């Protein structure tokens, strides 16, 4: 059982010093090097950063080994880290920086030319490398390290106002998650873990920490590879993976390649899915292609540390239910299905809101007490979270029944539809809009924007769409930009004067 994340990771530097903790595209980082570099960086931070330890450190970059060094160095200095991926638009990065109020902004990659960080010190990649060299051999005071209920990481998710909100995950939260996943998912020493998700997406925690805590190797597939199908299909078998961690959508992409099978990936015997609905046909095809593999379906919001339920997806499970179960709750957690209006706990078989209680639940949103109080509460001395997800329990399994609000999952990313709408309304060509999810195989397939445009001079609708998307890309991530655009002169309204979203949904999902 792990009680300290850092102590257990550092222990591998003694047990297997030369074993790679990270390996990709010719770049290799051993456990000994990870400890030495994170020690050096932790020492640098303790000597040079005199601000309040409650203020986190933003770590900007993609999937380089320097990200791991910066994460662990921050923890060793007693400060939580906020991962920010290079794929984020400048405006989003600025929003996160403003909301997090960090003590330091670390760059493991070069910042975009149109982004200027003000209000806190910035450490460039060159300065980071210089700090690692100058403080090489130094070991930070263990007492300074993040511990117990201290924040360990803060991940920013989509917020309904158009501004992201930072979910605080403590050392205790992460210890609870890590112990569960290492034991219940039978993850032994020295395995090679796929890292598909960027570190700013909490699905990455499902591969990063189980890998480091079990003396395994993290094998990232960065955005240059995943953006090119041929490169992706060539790279996967070359990585000799043992453990697959991804969204179901990424697996669907890989299943388009006939060579994605057990014969070409003989070590790949565990699949862990989280972040969105796992369709039965995806699970079934994986079992066809990888007959010796074990497939786990999991569920959990960022606010409950990645995942809190799991089920082994077998042929029997696939055949027994109309949709796949999300599984059973982890041992140190409780799960209630409650009436959304009254809060009354409902019996098995009745649909209601999923409420999570226990060791995995976050303390709330950073610097957002009002938003925290809206969804987090104390339940008999335990931290609890109203997920906004609708669920039902059958045969002891949790089943997902959709969102109670306008929040959806698309390709593993949690998105507030209101967030997209608020951003669309900033565009000069848009008077009003509504975002409708197009459903396919029990999950969101794409986002459809229904738009009332302002007066414009474009002759063709595709020209208008291109102009809108060109504006949007300046302040909204690519995964949030709708794929289909429908233009209207007016929206149907409900009796109380609101946009009739049911009518719009019926048009999109005929």
From Swiss-Prot:
Catalyzes the first step in the D-alanylation of lipoteichoic acid (LTA), the activation of D-alanine and its transfer onto the D-alanyl carrier protein (Dcp) DltC. In an ATP-dependent two-step reaction, forms a high energy D-alanyl-AMP intermediate, followed by transfer of the D-alanyl residue as a thiol ester to the phosphopantheinyl prosthetic group of the Dcp. D-alanylation of LTA plays an important role in modulating the properties of the cell wall in Gram-positive bacteria, influencing the net charge of the cell wall. Its main location: cytoplasm. The lineage of its organism: Bacteria, Bacillati, Bacillota, Bacilli, Bacillales. Pathway: Cell wall biogenesis; lipoteichoic acid biosynthesis. Its EC number is 6.2.1.54. Belongs to the ATP-dependent AMP-binding enzyme family. DltA subfamily. Transmembrane segments: none annotated. Keywords: ATP-binding, Cytoplasm, Ligase, Nucleotide-binding. It is an enzyme of class 6 (ligase). Pfam families: AMP-binding, AMP-binding_C. PROSITE patterns: AMP_BINDING. This is D-alanine--D-alanyl carrier protein ligase. CDD domains: DltA.
């Amino acid at each position: 059982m792990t009680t300290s994340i850092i102590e257990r990771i550092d222990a591998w530097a003694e047990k297997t010093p030369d074993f790679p903790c990270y390996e990709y595209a010719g770049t290799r980082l051993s456990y000994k090097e990870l400890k030495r570099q994170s020690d050096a960086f932790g020492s640098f931070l303790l000597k040079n950063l005199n601000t309040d330890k409650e203020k986190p450190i933003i770590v900007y970059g993609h999937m380089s080994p320097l990200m791991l060094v910066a994460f662990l160095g921050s923890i060793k200095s007693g400060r939580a880290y906020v991962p920010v991926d290079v794929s984020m638009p400048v405006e989003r990065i600025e929003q996160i920086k403003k909301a997090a109020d960090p003590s330091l902004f670390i760059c493991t990659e070069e910042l975009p030319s149109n982004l200027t960080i003000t209000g806190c010190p910035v450490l460039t990649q060159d300065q980071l490398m210089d700090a690692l060299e100058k403080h090489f051999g130094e070991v930070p005071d263990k007492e300074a390290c993040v511990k117990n209920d201290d924040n360990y990481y803060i991940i920013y998710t989509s917020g309904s106002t158009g501004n992201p909100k930072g979910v605080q995950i403590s050392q205790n939260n992460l210890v609870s998650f890590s112990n569960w996943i290492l034991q219940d998912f039978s993850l032994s020493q020295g395995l090679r873990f796929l890292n598909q998700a960027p570190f700013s997406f909490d699905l990455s925690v499902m591969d990063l920490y189980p890998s480091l805590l079990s003396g395994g190797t993290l094998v990232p597939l960065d955005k240059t590879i995943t953006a090119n199908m041929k490169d992706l299909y060539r790279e996967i078998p070359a990585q000799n993976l043992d453990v697959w961690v991804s969204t179901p959508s990424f697996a669907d992409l890989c299943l388009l390649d006939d060579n994605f099978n057990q014969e070409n990936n003989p070590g790949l015997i565990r699949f862990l899915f989280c972040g969105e609905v796992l369709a039965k046909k995806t699970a079934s095809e994986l079992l066809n292609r990888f007959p010796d593999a074990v497939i786990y379906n999991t569920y959990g919001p960022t606010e409950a540390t990645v995942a809190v339920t799991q089920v082994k997806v077998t042929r029997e499970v696939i055949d027994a239910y109309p949709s796949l179960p999300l599984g059973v709750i982890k041992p140190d957690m409780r799960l209630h299905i409650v009436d959304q209006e009254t809060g009354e706990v409902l019996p098995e078989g009745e649909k209601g809101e999923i409420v999570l209680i226990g060791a995995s639940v976050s303390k709330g949103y950073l610097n957002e007490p009002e938003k925290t109080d809206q969804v987090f509460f104390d339940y008999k001395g335990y931290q609890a979270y109203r997920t906004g997800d609708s669920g039902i329990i059958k045969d002891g399994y949790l089943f997902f029944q959709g969102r109670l609000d306008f929040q959806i999952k698309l390709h593993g990313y949690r998105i507030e539809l209101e967030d997209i709408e608020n951003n669309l309304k900033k565009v000069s060509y848009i008077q009003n809009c509504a975002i409708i999810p197009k459903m396919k195989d029990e999950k969101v397939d794409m986002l459809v924007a229904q738009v009332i445009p302002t007066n414009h001079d474009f002759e063709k609708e595709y020209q208008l769409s291109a102009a809108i998307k060109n504006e949007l890309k300046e302040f909204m991530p690519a995964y949030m930009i709708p794929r289909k655009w429908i233009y209207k002169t007016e929206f149907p309204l409900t009796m109380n004067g609101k946009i009739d979203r049911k009518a719009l949904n019926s048009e999109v999902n005929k």
